[in-house]
Amino acid sequence: MMGDSVIYYVEQADEPVNRADERARKTFKYFWRELFWERRRIISALDFAMVKVPFFQDGEDGEICEHMWIDDIYFDGLYIYGVLNNEPGELTNVEQGESVCVPVDDISDWMFVCNGIPYGGFTIQAMRGQMTEEERTEHDAAWGIDFGDPGQILLVYEEKEHPENLEEHPMCRNCIDDFRQQLSQNSDYLREQDEDGYTPLHHEAIAGNALMVQAMLEYGANPASTTSEGYTALDFACLTGWQNVADLLEPRH
């Protein structure tokens, strides 16, 4: 897996990497959905999951920026929380192992690895696309991962074999009947709110679990419930880009 030395300093004027940054931000929802379900698994399926974010510090010759990876990720629909995985090269205002919080729109990449297969890694593939074959081999050996064709980036598990996994996570499809059965016996928990005002409906909407959201609504979940900052489940579905979830939560007239 990644070592502390595997840090890449990227010029912000690098157009392929800038495009990769944007793709990572637009598709982050798939990363969080996978991590959401990973936490429900009895046996972990992921080798690791990380998000790359930029860190800044004023230097003698101007601003210094290092793009580094964080893990132990949590996402509340607005902010990403994690722990810095890398040892900074030049920065002195942040340390490896330090807890960090960044707006989701600030990320520059995401990646998870399942059974040795990488998903995401947009900036990695952008940089690999500019390398020679020998350089790519050395790069992949440093990570301990075969990143394959730089032009092919997977977003979800078994995407090629099951493109429907883009729309709904396979674990969601597999457990929805049991979930409905549980709700039919006791749906009281749907009205619970955590210390920040999030309900179960908020969390499922952020993760893009349309089948779960639909079942919750049928069993009395209140789509008008707001977090302490005033966000509804619909707000989060729109912010994260889950249109199929937003369609379920739109008020009916």
UniProtKB/Swiss-Prot annotation:
Keywords: ANK repeat, Repeat
SUPFAM superfamilies with a match to the protein in the record: Ankyrin repeat
InterPro entries noted in UniProt: Ankyrin_rpt, Ankyrin_rpt-contain_sf, DUF2314
ANK repeats: 196-225, 229-252
Name of the protein in its database record: Putative ankyrin repeat protein NMB1133/NMB1171
SMART domains on file: ANK (SM00248)
Cited Gene3D superfamilies: Ankyrin repeat-containing domain
Pfam families in the record: Ank_2, DUF2314
